[in-house]
Amino acid sequence: MGQQVIIISKILKILNINRIYNKLLLNNLNNVKKLIIIGPKIKDLIITRYIINYILYI
């Protein structure tokens, strides 16, 4: 009996995570237009950050 409860709670957690993820996706769809404008700048920032981290670790 206890095992079933654990499995059910895990499934509920996954469903809850999916619900939150879907909300985030909907919010992201609203932000996509902004991201298309900002996206390349963010990508450059991330790439430069990786390069800096890589240089620092060597």
Curated annotation (Swiss-Prot):
This is Uncharacterized 6.8 kDa protein in VAR1 3'region. It comes from the Eukaryota. The lineage of its organism: Eukaryota, Fungi, Dikarya, Ascomycota, Saccharomycotina. Its main location: mitochondrion. One of its GO terms (cellular component) is mitochondrion. It is found in: Mitochondrion. Keywords: Mitochondrion.
